[in-house]
């Protein structure tokens, strides 16, 4: 007979699963113990745990990020603690990424900007928070919040959209 060439992993796995384990006990071993039933189930339990470990290792490998970064791709700076990255700009215009302290979100002026964003995009908006106004208008609101002014009316009018 010709020897089959190929993987021997099937034979190795079956030997590992069905190998007999010896329990070293001092003293008397019962003939009809419940441990014999456990020994019969052990190969299946071994196979199950081996499959679970194999699945976990594949998941870990698939969730790792690739080290490849395209040449023209610029990685975004990480957001510092206590800040949130938002995008300022019109839908069709150029959006700017701005880091805003989280404390600003409680301010009434910023609340008005968020209400405008809700009217424009709604709650089911994919991506980050986008404020639909000009970048210069947003900078004015940001400086007013930083200076401590709590006026609810915009100096340039009610709407910050074009």
UniProtKB/Swiss-Prot annotation:
Q: What happens when the gene is disrupted?
A: Increased leaf size and delayed senescence.
Entries under InterPro entries matching the protein: SAUR_fam (IPR003676)
What inducers act on this gene? By senescence. Induced by auxin. Down-regulated by gibberellin.
| Keyword Membrane carried by entry | no
* Record GO biological process: auxin-activated signaling pathway; positive regulation of leaf senescence; regulation of seed germination
Tissue specificity, per the record, is: Expressed in embryo, endosperm, growing hypocotyls and shoot apical meristems.
Q: Which UniProt keywords apply?
A: Auxin signaling pathway, Developmental protein, Growth regulation
Where is the secretion signal located?
none
Top-level lineage group: Eukaryota
A GO term from the CC aspect: nucleus
Q: Per its UniProt record, what PANTHER family does this chain match?
A: AUXIN-INDUCED PROTEIN-LIKE-RELATED, AUXIN-RESPONSIVE PROTEIN SAUR36
Similarity comment: family membership = Belongs to the ARG7 family.
Q: What does this protein do?
A: Acts a positive regulator of leaf senescence and may mediate auxin-induced leaf senescence. Plays a role in the regulation of seed germination by gibberellins and abscisic acid (ABA). Plays a role in the regulation of light-dependent hypocotyl elongation.
- What is the protein named? Auxin-responsive protein SAUR36
